[in-house]
């Protein structure tokens, strides 16, 4: 253990392996978001632009698998919600609980399941998988943690998992 970084708090240890922040998409999956995303990166794949092609190839219009996290990004403001709304809330919890003022996403891996179709309603939850011993990198001293974000459609089918490796740290001068 580093002199500057305390042991992993029991509060964090108690969270490992437990589903956190279960939520459902605020709207049905729809093509407007898909068209905007594809236009932004100039992806002309007819699978996403041509309904007939999508029907022929996969039986329905679908969203690109890489858009999975888009469906759970909260709007900054929405009626009925109070306080700050952030995606990947468990990441911010780790920073706060472990008193690590800085943090980065140092790695991201995606596992894709069944395609996300137009009209789907998705559910998700976050799971803290692990927290490392104290590490020192070029940016500072802190800990790595891994968070899985698992997502399912309204039929309970797995549509994907995003695995985030995060590094929370203190800069050398902090």
Where are these regions (language model features)?
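Hot-dog-fold acyl-thioester-processing enzymes
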Residues: 2-107, 173-174
């Amino acid at each position: 253990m580093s002199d500057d970084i305390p042991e992993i708090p029991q509060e964090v240890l108690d969270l490992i392996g437990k589903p956190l922040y279960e939520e459902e998409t605020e709207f049905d999956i729809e093509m407007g978001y898909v068209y905007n995303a594809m236009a932004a990166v100039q992806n002309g794949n007819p699978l996403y632009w041509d309904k007939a092609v999508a029907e022929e190839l996969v039986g329905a219009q679908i969203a690109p698998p890489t858009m999975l996290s888009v469906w759970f990004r909260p709007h900054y403001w929405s009626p009925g919600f109070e306080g700050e709304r952030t995606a990947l809330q468990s990441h911010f919890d780790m920073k706060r609980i472990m008193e690590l003022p800085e943090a980065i996403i140092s790695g991201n891996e995606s596992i894709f399941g069944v395609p996300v179709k137009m009209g789907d309603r998705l559910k998700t939850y976050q799971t803290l998988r692990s927290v490392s011993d104290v590490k020192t990198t070029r940016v500072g001293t802190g800990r790595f943690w891994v968070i899985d974000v698992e997502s399912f459609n309204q039929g309970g089918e797995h549509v994907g998992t995003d695995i985030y490796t995060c590094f929370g740290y203190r800069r050398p001068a902090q």
